Amino acid sequence: MKRREFGALAAGALAMGLPFRAFADETCQSPYMPKITGQEEFVYVWTLGVEGMGDEQDKLVTIDLRPGSATRGQVINSVSVGGRNEAHHGGFSADRRFFWTGGLDTNRIFIFDVHSDPSNPKLHKTIDTFVKDSGGVVGPHTFFALPGSMMITGLSNDDDHGGRTALVEYNDDGEYVATYWMPTADDMQGAVAVGDAVADGYGYDIRALIRKNVMLTSSFTGWSNYMMDFGQMLQDAEAMKRFGNTIVQWDLHTRQPKKVFNVPGAPLEIRFPWGSNANYAFSTTALTSQLWLIYEDDAGEWQAKAVADIGNPADIPLPVDISIAADDQTLWINSFMDGKTRLFDISDPHKPFQIYEKVIDRQVNMVSQSWDGKRVYFSSSLLANWDKKGKDDAQYLKAYNWDGKELVEDFAVDFYELGLGRAHIMRFGSSALYSS
C-alpha cells in the first residue's frame, strides 16, 4: 500500500467512525496512525549529545523490549546524526513508516526509516531548510501526523528569538507545504479571545479531535529562553515574562484559528481521550502547576478551566509530560523538579484527583505507556541547559510494570554510563506493523 493510499484509508475510516487500531501503542499518538495494541517490541529514544561524551552527537537510540529476547532491556542500535542540535521531540508519519525528529537549536529535521528494519532504524532524510521554508519559524517541536502530511509546531522565530511562532506543514516526502502563524493581539486572524485572554502568538504542542474538526495548540517560550541556563533564567525577571499563557482552538480542516483561551503559566502537552463521546482534552501548566480541561460545553462551544493542582504549586514542581490511558480513566503526570510521576483519576474530567505518586529519579521528563496500561516508561532530559547539574543530572530510560496499584521497576538503562547522552522523547516500534 502506498503512503498516500494509507492516509486516505485512515481518514476515511475515521470519518465513518471506524476504529483504526490494527495495532497500537502509546496512547498519545496521532489518531490517524495505526497503534500497537499488543506488546511493543522496541522503544526509540531521541537523545541529546553531550560534549565530551561518546561521539558527542544527537542520536536515535533503539532499546529492545521483546519478551524472551537475549537483549531485552538493552540498547541494540544507535544512529548518530552529526553534531548537537538540541534533540527534543518527534513523531511518526501517519503510515508509521517514518519517524520525524527535530533539533530546537539548529532547526534541522531528521527523518528516520523505522519500517525497513524496526530493530535498526536508518536516517532517511535531513531537512536543513526549515527556517527558510517556513518564513522564519525557529524550533521545530511537536510532529503531529495528518494523512499525507506532518504538522510541526514551532517554538520561536528568527527575528527576535522570542515566542512568536507558527505551525509548519510538510508533506510526507519532506516537501514544504505551508506556514500558519499563531494569532496575536495585533493580528487575530479571525479568532476570538475568550474572556481576558490575550493572544501571545506562542506555540508548543498540537493535538486534534477529528470528528469535531477541532485542533488545539499550546504555548511555551522562545529560543532566547529555552537555550538559556535554567538557573540564570529563573533570576532574569524579563526572561520570566517571556512564557506563553494561551491555548488556541483551530479549525482542523481550514487551519484557521477560532478561539484563544487564557491558560496562565505555560500550558505544555495536550491530550485528547479516545472515547467516542469524549469531547475534551487535558493540558498542564509548567509554571503554575495546574491541570486544565479544554472541553465542549452543552451549547457546543469550547471552553477552558483549571480543574486540579499538581502537587504543591508553591513548590513549582514543574509539570512536564502527561499520558492518558486508553480507557480514558487515568492520566499520568510527570513533574521535573521533584522527579515524580503522579496518577490522576479523570473518570469525571471536570473533577480529577490524584490517586498515586512515585519518585522516579532526581529528575524526570517524558512518560509513555503501553495500550493496555500495564507497562509505563520514563525518560529524563528536559533541555540541555535546563537539566539538573552534577549528581542530580540522572539520564536514563526506565521501564515499569503497573498492576493498578504500584509501579514496579522492570529495567533501567543509564544513558550516561553508556556514553549516549541525554534521553528525551520515547516512541514504540513493532515489526508486526509492517508484516502484512
Swiss-Prot record:
GO terms for molecular function: methanethiol oxidase activity; selenium binding. Keywords: Oxidoreductase, Periplasm, Plasmid, Signal. It is found in: Periplasm. The keyword Protein transport does not apply. Transmembrane segments: none annotated. Its EC number is 1.8.3.4. Catalyzes the oxidation of methanethiol. This is Methanethiol oxidase. PANTHER family: METHANETHIOL OXIDASE (PTHR23300:SF0). Residues 1-24 form the signal peptide. The keyword Signal applies. It catalyses: methanethiol + O2 + H2O = hydrogen sulfide + formaldehyde + H2O2 + H(+). Induction: Induced by methanethiol, dimethylsulfoniopropionate (DMSP) and methylmercaptopropionic acid (MMPA). SUPFAM superfamilies: YVTN repeat-like/Quinoprotein amine dehydrogenase (SSF50969). InterPro entries: Quino_amine_DH_bsu, Se-bd. GO terms for cellular component: periplasmic space. Pathway: Organosulfur degradation.
